[in-house]
Amino acid sequence: DKKDYSRIIGVAFLGMCINMLMFFKGLELSTPINSGVIVTLTPIIILILSSIFLNESLNFPKISGIIIGFTGAVILIIYGNQSIVINAPNIPLGNILLLGNSISYGAYLVFVKKLTEKYQTVTIMKWMFLVGSFMTFPVTYSDFIEISWNNMPFFALWRIGFVVICTTFLTYFLNVYALKTLPPTTI
């Protein structure tokens, strides 16, 4: 349906482009502890966005969970690992990018819900990955061509394939499939 084009482009932008680019750059700039803690904010973000855009009710247990989860994440980030970090060149920027990643992925899960009510999972994934690939291409092309694919050992190629297929494609596929019957806050 032509009226769904903008939603497909929007969820591809949120779920494939912004989400992935901010996540990987945030990992590069921040610490592993901070990245793990900030990514745990995603369910809180989904709950808030679902209440705003999908009219899901916020009750006392949900609001309490938001407050406790957010407080715990902030405490861990501020008071967590106090040791000197060598390989995190810009922790504040990395943390902001990781928060942007969590927000964009949460928004993706909320906004893709409408598409799951209308289209098959494979159809959504096909268009989302295609559109997302075109969106990320200008940013990732220079890194991609620097890789010496011919000299890469098979075990490295196999591991890259595993990450792309199992941890990326299957995760997105199963999330979209689950959204056909469940609200985003459950996923």
Annotate each language-model stretch with its function.
Residues 1-39, 75, 164-182:
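Specific transmembrane alpha-helical segments of multi-pass solute transporters/efflux pumps
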Residues 9, 58-81, 136:
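Hydrophobic transmembrane alpha-helices of multi-pass small-molecule transport proteins
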Residues 23-63, 184-187:
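Specific alpha-helical transmembrane segments that line the substrate/conduction pathway
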Residues 25-42, 91-103, 155-165:
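Structural signature of hydrophobic alpha-helical transmembrane segments
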Residues 26, 52-54, 58, 115, ...:
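Hydrophobic/aromatic residues within transmembrane alpha-helices
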Residues 28, 77-91, 141-160:
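Membrane-interface helix termini and inter-helical loops of multi-pass transporters
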Residues 43-51, 66, 73-76, 109, ...:
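Hydrophobic transmembrane alpha-helices of multi-pass small-molecule transporters
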Residues 46-47, 84-144, 174:
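Transmembrane alpha-helical segments that form core, pore/gating elements
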